[in-house]
Amino acid sequence: MRFVLSLVSALTILTFARLTLAETVQIEFTDQDSYSIEVAKIDVGDTVVWLPTNKGHNVEFLAGPKLNTLSRKSEIDAFHSVVFKHPGVYLYQCTPHGNMGMLGLIIVGEDFHNLESIKKIELSRVSASVLKRLIRIAQSRTNSL
């Protein structure tokens, strides 16, 4: 019985420690029609905050696991915050500048299980080229860990 109580206590402490260690990544809208961090690698439970440091931009998710649990699109020039609860790759764009390549990737939990479906998304020629570059960056960061 003591072992079970010790185990439950240890798991509770680890869970609480993980919750308190969740990080926040801040991404700014730049004046060059891009995001200040184009590929963010985070853990499950971390938060990404997009800051409207330049006007005319937003965040619109195009793909990712369980998108129905996220706010799919922010207002233009608005602060936006998302807690990522599901591992996988998330692709987002700026709605007004998406066709010009203003894209970003969030890799949650080093999980690439849905990458092939993201590669198949129809994008403009410029955006498709940007996405290929972002995927190379994401994969090179994972391979170097």
Model-derived features: where do they sit?
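Positively charged n-region of N-terminal signal peptides that target proteins for export
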Residues: 1-5
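Bacterial N-terminal signal peptides
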Residues: 6-15
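Extracytoplasmic copper-binding redox domains, predominantly the cupredoxin/blue-copper superfamily
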Residues: 19-145
